[in-house]
Amino acid sequence: MYKIEKVSPDVVRPLRHKVLRPNLPFEASCLPSDNDPDAIHFTLKKDDTILSVASLYSESLEAMPNKNAYRLRGMATEPAKQRKGFGAMVLHGAMDHLKKETDVEILWCNARVT
């Protein structure tokens, strides 16, 4: 059974480093806003194995500065588990949390293909 959990930033960093910044020092996986009070970090797990992670930060969108916005960053899925929908699952869990627990109006991101 799959489970989405809200976690500390230390929990998401190993997978974030492995997938997004493997050729950089581990510290490169620490994003500047990781410990902000409004930062939220999620894992998707099966049993005790983390399959996917995502982090959300309270950050306005330049094109809509008057809207309450969160930014998605540091999203990663275990390489052997990619293309199976796990990224979508953790993202939907994060969006459900925002809808229930915040007054956010916009969720935005900058995307890259790795």
Predicted features by range, described:
Residues E59-L72, Q82, E101-E105:
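A conserved beta-turn-beta hairpin within the catalytic core of GNAT-like acetyltransferases
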Residues V11, V113-T114:
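Short alpha-helical
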Residues D10-H17, A88:
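Short amphipathic alpha-helical segments
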Residues L91, L98-R112:
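Conserved GNAT acetyl-CoA-binding A-motif
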Residues T43, T49-S60, R71-A76:
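Conserved beta-strand in the GNAT
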Residues R16-D47, L51:
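Active-site rim helix/loop that mediates acceptor-substrate recognition in acyltransferases
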